């Protein structure tokens, strides 16, 4: 019989909040007896935005801002229905985007 995998992908702008969320999810999943693989750090997306400092002239004077999106992957092997119920009830901070695939 092939083992089932639940993949949880977390995204956010602050890596510390993502790591705290991962620890909460691991603690909840291991409490139900499921095996957890990860956290696996995924590549960070970096978006750079360049704007002109002056409104009318001085095109050579520019300012750059960047926005980094940190990502982590967590795999739960052979999740039970109780594991899924517990994961639905985990309270996570705002600023963390979660994708769950079975």
Curated annotation (Swiss-Prot):
Annotated GO MF terms: structural constituent of ribosome; tRNA binding
One GO term describing the cellular component: ribosome
Keywords for this protein: Ribonucleoprotein, Ribosomal protein
GO biological process: translation
SMART domains per UniProt: Ribosomal_S10 (SM01403)
Alphabetized InterPro entries for the sequence: Ribosomal_uS10, Ribosomal_uS10_CS, Ribosomal_uS10_dom, Ribosomal_uS10_dom_sf
Subunit structure: Part of the 30S ribosomal subunit.
UniProt family annotation: Belongs to the universal ribosomal protein uS10 family.
Chain's role: Involved in the binding of tRNA to the ribosomes.
NCBIfam families membership: PRK00596.1, rpsJ_bact
Name recorded for this polypeptide: Small ribosomal subunit protein uS10
Organism: Mesoplasma florum (strain ATCC 33453 / NBRC 100688 / NCTC 11704 / L1)
Gene name of this polypeptide: rpsJ
């Amino acid at each position: 019989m092939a083992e089932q995998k639940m993949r949880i992908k977390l995204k956010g702008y602050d890596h510390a909040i993502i790591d705290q969320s991962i620890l909460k999810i691991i603690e909840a999943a291991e409490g139900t007896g499921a095996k957890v693989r990860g956290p696996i750090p995924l590549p960070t997306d970096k978006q750079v935005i360049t704007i002109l400092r002056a409104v009318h002239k001085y095109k050579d004077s520019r300012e750059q801002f960047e926005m980094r999106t940190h990502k982590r992957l967590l795999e739960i092997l052979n999740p039970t229905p109780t594991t899924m119920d517990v994961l639905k009830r985990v309270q996570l901070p705002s600023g963390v985007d979660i994708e769950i695939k079975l």
